[in-house]
């Protein structure tokens, strides 16, 4: 599990390779990832938007920006958490993702929280140690 905390908001990510949705012959690998956002702060916050940087095993990057996550802009009171699962395809057997969520406090302040960088590994990926 990967973890980051920004302003008392914890984000954890657990990636999972999905062989049933992947095809080595077609050059397609697919992962799901489950994100849990926990508000340990004293103020209610709302997730407004997301920003992802997806990097495949060849170093090609794709940026994704959009409102909310999985069609929602969850509101998290102190002590509450929100969990969702999404997916990502790559044209290589490995890669990684990183990003941020734009949050808004009950007082209207907007700020970014870190989504920890996480590795997308498949059994077909070659591990290289530098």
Swiss-Prot record:
<dbReference type="InterPro" id="IPR007474">
    <property type="entry name" value="ApaG_domain"/>
</dbReference>
<dbReference type="InterPro" id="IPR023065">
    <property type="entry name" value="Uncharacterised_ApaG"/>
</dbReference>
<protein>
    <recommendedName>
        <fullName>Protein ApaG</fullName>
    </recommendedName>
</protein>
<dbReference type="Pfam" id="PF04379">
    <property type="entry name" value="DUF525"/>
</dbReference>
<dbReference type="GO" id="GO:0070987">
    <property type="term" value="P:error-free translesion synthesis"/>
</dbReference>
<dbReference type="InterPro" id="IPR036767">
    <property type="entry name" value="ApaG_sf"/>
</dbReference>
<feature type="domain" description="ApaG">
    <location>
        <begin position="3"/>
        <end position="127"/>
    </location>
</feature>
């Amino acid at each position: 599990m990967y973890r980051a905390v920004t302003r008392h908001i914890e984000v954890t990510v657990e990636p999972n390779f999905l062989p049933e949705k992947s095809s080595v012959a077609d050059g397609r690998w697919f992962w799901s990832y489950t994100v849990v956002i926990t508000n340990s702060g004293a103020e209610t916050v709302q997730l407004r938007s997301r920003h992802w940087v997806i990097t495949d095993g060849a170093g090609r990057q794709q940026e994704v920006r959009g409102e909310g996550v999985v069609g929602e802009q969850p509101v998290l009171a102190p002590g509450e958490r929100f969990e969702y699962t999404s997916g990502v395809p790559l044209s290589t057997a490995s890669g990684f993702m990183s990003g941020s969520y734009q949050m808004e406090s009950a007082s209207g302040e907007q700020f970014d929280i870190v989504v920890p960088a996480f590795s997308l590994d498949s059994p077909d990926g070659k591990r290289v140690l530098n």
